[in-house]
Amino acid sequence: MEFAFGSMGMQDKAKHLATLYLEDLSDFIVECIDENFGFSRYAERLGRSANSFDELYNHLQNELTFIDEITIKILKERAEKVQPKLVLISVPFPGNLYSAFRCAQFIKANYPNIKLS
């Protein structure tokens, strides 16, 4: 393995090993906790199938996943602390679509006075 990392050997090797560790952690979460998990693309498959929103809609009707619970907990804490009148949600990638809708769903249900855009 030592020859594969060139003159930046230690740093490159550390990055490589950290990436392998994170990939294994992600695989564990997908298999045991939330099948839609991804570090940079949570539920990306649902966003990519957006020619029909049926599958996405069905997932939004399900119970919160463990990852959803963490996201909603943080969102609730921020909403109560900041007390915004308007929340803007950006969806730059398909992997952001599910979480954006899940957050919007939570805000609409629990903070009807907050405008969403």
Task: Report the location of each language-model feature.
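A short, structured N-terminal alpha-helical element that caps or precedes a catalytic domain
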Residues: 1-117
